[in-house]
Amino acid sequence: MSVISMKQLLEAGVHFGWQTRRWNPKMKKYIFTERNGIYLIDIQKTVKKVEEAYNFVRELAANGGKILFVGTKRQAQESVKEEAERCGMFYVNQRRIGGTLTNFATLQKRIKRLREIEKMEEDGVFDVLPKKEVIGLKKEKERLEKFIGGIKDMKELPDALFVIDPRKERIAVAEARKLNIPIIGIVDTNNDPCEGGYVIPANDDAIRAVKLLTSKIADAVLEAKQGEEAAVAAE
């Protein structure tokens, strides 16, 4: 049984690519046809590529691997957060701070600062500080939570990146490639398929399409975890 059906892909609008004048020729093999000035993606290939990515993620998660979901465009922000949280993985869904992967020590300092402020609030320190200082600390906490809240529990580099629109997230992709971290990318017809290790040719601008594909990656993680739990129970 397939991980995903062509019917699901069609209903979510996964097959709609970009205007023909804004395409990347490297995506030619994933294009089915052109209609009214828009390229339509060959979703038979999308089905196959989703299965490949699903199997890779399931195997990775079964071996304790961690995945970082990345999607900062408006259409992806909600799905990235919801699905990463659903499967217990990390995410970045706001404007990325350069060096998140390549300068991991700096990221850890930011996480440490967020933890410090959270502890101050929990311990009642805010109650004895001047109001102006408390306001400043709360603003700092909100900003840190917004940008690194999804990775504050990430104690080491992820084992793979799942990226919506590698073209937009080119900094994250470049950092991952530099560190030899595998990439799974939802790649539209205006993208470079070489930028994603596991390419999923699909519409990366439709909220329903992004949600569907992101949920499948989360499902792969959950299937691996369920298998792990079943194995432990059997022992």
Swiss-Prot record:
Pfam families: Ribosomal_S2
GO cellular component: cytosolic small ribosomal subunit
Keywords from the UniProt entry: Ribonucleoprotein, Ribosomal protein
Molecular function as annotated in GO: structural constituent of ribosome
UniProt-listed PROSITE patterns: RIBOSOMAL_S2_1, RIBOSOMAL_S2_2
Alphabetical GO biological process terms: translation
Domain of life: Bacteria
Chain segments annotated as transmembrane: none
Protein family (similarity comment): Belongs to the universal ribosomal protein uS2 family.
PANTHER family: 30S RIBOSOMAL PROTEIN S2 PROKARYOTIC AND ORGANELLAR (PTHR12534), SMALL RIBOSOMAL SUBUNIT PROTEIN US2M (PTHR12534:SF0)
Protein name according to UniProt: Small ribosomal subunit protein uS2
